[in-house]
């Protein structure tokens, strides 16, 4: 297998095998940051020329503003001087009272971005998989606060394990469409797919779906589909 963040070089995103980069490494930070939001884009073009499975390297890396309450957890030989310095600068700027808001807002945004990036992997047929930079924060080497968990493997309260597994699990239902925002008179068109990395054959199984309003919980439409057998790869 091959573990890159891109398979070769190009002037566009056609060789990318993850959805985001630094602005120094890709035009405007990559697919997620610089293309119209949708759930159809995948990495099929990037993996087409590779004869072995591709595993996306360090998917994510979405920065989350740190929660300074974790400073008290450092009771061993590692001192959180970086966190203390960040808090000092925020205090000098007169914004220390907003620290929790910054942590919560950036964390909620990071969860959405992780979902977008991971689902891009899952809807790429024939993809070998992905690896995150880390599920937890890494406070060394320049402070990589990119984790859904803090450096002590404790939850930041951003998402429950159950919600995380809705898009990061061995079997994930996916809705494929060209946009993620609609107005009242738009028709919604899309495809339903199942990303299945489990050992189970799901062909013939029934999948129930429901479209509802999140604010009122009112059901708009329901239905069922039958999972079709996947065509076998030739050659």
What does each of the following model-derived ranges do?
Residues 1-150:
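Substrate-binding/catalytic cleft of secreted carbohydrate-active enzymes
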Residues 57, 133-136, 167, 195, ...:
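Generic beta-strand/beta-sheet core signal
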Residues 106, 178-180, 197:
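Outer-membrane beta-barrel proteins
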Residues 114, 123, 157, 185, ...:
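Active-site-proximal structural scaffolding
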Residues 153, 158-173:
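Proline/serine/threonine-rich low-complexity linkers at boundaries of modular beta-sandwich domains
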Residues 180-186:
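Short, solvent-exposed loop/linker segments at the N-terminal edge
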Residues 186-228:
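Beta-strand-rich binding/interaction modules
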Residues 232-235:
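Aromatic sugar-binding surface patches on proteins
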């Amino acid at each position: 297998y091959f573990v890159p963040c891109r398979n070769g070089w190009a002037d566009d995103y056609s060789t990318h095998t993850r959805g985001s980069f630094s602005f120094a490494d890709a035009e405007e930070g990559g697919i997620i940051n610089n293309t119209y939001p949708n759930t159809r884009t995948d990495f099929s073009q990037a993996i087409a020329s590779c004869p072995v499975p591709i595993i996306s390297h360090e998917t994510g890396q979405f920065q989350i503003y740190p929660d300074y309450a974790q400073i008290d957890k450092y009771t061993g030989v590692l001192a959180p001087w970086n966190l203390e310095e960040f808090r000092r600068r925020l205090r000098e700027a007169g914004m220390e009272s907003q620290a929790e808001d910054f942590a919560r807002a950036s964390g909620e945004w990071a969860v959405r971005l992780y979902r977008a990036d991971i689902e891009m992997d899952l809807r790429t047929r024939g993809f070998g998989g992905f690896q995150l930079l880390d599920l937890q924060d890494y406070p060394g080497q320049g402070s990589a606060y990119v984790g859904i968990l803090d450096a002590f493997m404790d939850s930041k309260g951003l998402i429950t394990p159950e919600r995380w597994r809705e898009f990061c699990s061995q079997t994930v239902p996916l809705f494929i469409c060209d946009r993620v925002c609609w107005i009242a008179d738009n028709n919604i068109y899309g495809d339903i797919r199942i990303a299945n990395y489990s050992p189970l054959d799901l062909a013939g199984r029934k999948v129930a779906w429901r479209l509802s309003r999140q604010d009122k919980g009112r059901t708009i439409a329901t239905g069922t589909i039958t999972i079709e057998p996947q065509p076998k790869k030739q050659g």
